[in-house]
Design a protein with these regions (language model features):
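N-terminal helix-turn-helix DNA-binding core of bacterial DNA-binding proteins
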Residues: 2-49, 71-76
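Amphipathic alpha-helical dimerization/coiled-coil segments
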Residues: 7-8, 83-96
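Basic amphipathic alpha-helical segments that dock to polyanions
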Residues: 53-57
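A short, conserved structural fragment
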Residues: 58-67
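Basic, amphipathic "hinge/linker" alpha-helix immediately C-terminal to the N-terminal HTH DNA-binding motif
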Residues: 69-88
Length: 96
């Protein structure tokens, strides 16, 4: 039986190892909630790749898609992941 820390690490690792996921979540956290805003805020990202990644994030309940307002909102899990991304950036600046 795996421990909570191992399970938690695996879940986070499965998401952050995917290209563009940190950038998408950080973009949403900065207020880019509409599809085109997210796309325009990330250089070199294609429509196809953004669609794929947003589908994964919705499926994993990291973001919620609001079809009425046509926007994406971070779930609590997504907010926690953004916090982790910023912490990792701080560690990189401090130690590398």
């Amino acid at each position: 039986m795996k421990t909570k820390i191992v399970n938690g690490f695996e879940v986070v690792h499965d998401l952050i190892k995917l290209k563009w996921i940190p950038e998408i979540l950080k973009s949403i956290s900065h207020g880019n909630e509409k599809y085109i805003e997210i796309l325009n805020s990330i250089p070199y990202m294609s429509h196809t790749e953004l669609n794929r990644k947003l589908a994964i994030l919705v499926d994993k309940e990291v973001v919620e898609k609001n079809n009425i307002e046509n926007k994406y909102v971070l779930e609590e899990f997504g907010k926690d992941l953004v916090h982790i991304f910023y912490h990792l950036e701080d560690l990189e600046e401090k130690y590398f």
